[in-house]
Amino acid sequence: MADKDQGPATEWQSAQAAAIGHGAVAAINGGFFTPEGKPLGLVIEEGKRIGTWNSQSSLTSGLLSVEKSPRLLRRQHWRSFSPTRHLLQAGPFLIENSAVVRDLSDRERRPRSFLVWNGRHRWAFGIAEGVTLASLSAALAAQPLSEITITTALNLDGGRSSDLWASPRIPGGPVSTRRIWNTPVRNYLLLLPSR
């Protein structure tokens, strides 16, 4: 997790800049933020709380929580007293228990950023162009990744915020999805190399 204390227009202007600035091999835009540049929900970076807990919006219905190991869970299952190193509220869920999430919007085709997990130790993040939440959920439920069986998928901020970068150290890299029309974002999820 890399959050910009001073808001979206400061520090790293792209996923690539955020990744390089933190020694990461890949990065993707993170959670939603308000027009004033504040996180829409709670963000925790290295134990520091940023923003406030949001229990209302579907855009914060799930979270990535990193305690001893990372996991995706619904906001009602996280406890504020947990020793959380990193946390990002985002949403909605696209896949839960290896199944499509019902009642997702089938309107607004746009770029979507997402995070997937196999429920154990395998993770991936990606961007899909011109899809609805419902169509992305269906596509992910079809298990398109040969190296990971997706049990859980979480929608991240998308649209003009969608920005993924992978270095040449990643198989298939380098990759950058940044477009001229991208807007600065509040935070990024980072993939750090194994130590």
Locations of regions flagged by a protein language model:
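Gly/Ser/Thr/Pro-rich low-complexity, intrinsically disordered segments
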Residues: 1-195
